[in-house]
From Swiss-Prot:
InterPro entries: GAF-like_dom_sf, HrcA, HrcA_C, WH-like_DNA-bd_sf, WH_DNA-bd_sf, WHTH_HrcA_DNA-bd, WHTH_transcript_rep_HrcA_IDD. One of its GO terms (molecular function) is DNA binding. Pfam families: HrcA, HrcA_DNA-bdg. NCBIfam families: hrcA (TIGR00331). Gene3D superfamilies: 3.30.450.40, Heat-inducible transcription repressor hrca homolog, domain 3 (3.30.390.60), Winged helix-like DNA-binding domain superfamily/Winged helix DNA-binding domain (1.10.10.10). This is Heat-inducible transcription repressor HrcA. Negative regulator of class I heat shock genes (grpE-dnaK-dnaJ and groELS operons). Prevents heat-shock induction of these operons. It comes from the Bacteria. Belongs to the HrcA family. Keywords: Repressor, Stress response, Transcription, Transcription regulation.
Amino acid sequence: MLNERAKILLKTLVERYIHEGQPVGSRSLAKFSGLDLSPATIRNVMTDLEEMGFVSSPHTSAGRMPTTLGYRFFVDTLLVVQSLDNEQITLLENRMHPNNPSHLINVTSRLLSDLTQFVGVVVTPKRMGGAVFRHIEFVPLSEKRILLILVTPEGDVQNRIIFTETVYNQSDLIEAGNFLNQHYAGCALEEIRSGLQHELTQLRRNMTDLMNAAIEIGNAALQESSEAVVIAGEHKLFDVRDLSENLSSLKQLFELFERKSKLLQLMELSRQACGVKIFIGGESDETMLEEISVVTAPYEMEGKIVGTVGVIGPRRMAYERIIPIVDITARLLSNNLS
């Protein structure tokens, strides 16, 4: 357990390192800590902190820099979070209009990037209550191949091919599409499946088979696309000295942005948190790269957590400023979606 003096010096060291990007020496610690200590005493405390794994000393410098453990202790114990000023809150409120969910998600990721100058990330919500369609259409491709076209309430279009044992003519396909659009548009596909069981008296058996196949394939297609990662501001990482000096790490990071699956797993962990969660690079495999930290927060729709927002940047980021931006953005997004 650190005593109060060691905590103050560690806090000062992390703050100066975040601000300057250079190892911090005892003279700088004496100046900014507010403690009336001799350089020798400060060096002794730094030696203790280094032995405990909170700081490290590069061979090329007499100063010290925080380790992953040092960052974690700082964030969990020593950090004083700043409040957003009214101008920033007003900017968020004015630009986050709830007129279109897809547009709102894209705007949110760009806002996070603009306000932090790092990468803004939003995991789009999983569809509530199952996959829903606004319009459905069947297009013949060959005797036993049919193109299924599904349009979601958000305007997304999904195309899938249905392979059938039965040959359907053009009028059959139009009839099936019209029936589903007339009776079930706006309903969850799972609800339609059970509803079709009661329509056997009105529909021919082969038509019911076609519709059930469409429901099964359509449901899978919409669930596949029901969650995605929206990323904005990746290019801003080239302006971050800690990252731009290591092209290998930047390449790995951009590969993660391309694949998105690992990033989605990381963001998914945020759903279990009550409020902001911080992943600091080097702590585990979940944080992707040692030089990267991720600040995330879950957001809600109608009282249920449906996604996460986050900022990806260097470990040497101003956590006291980034955390409230992510927190308030998640709250505003929840309000607009609900």
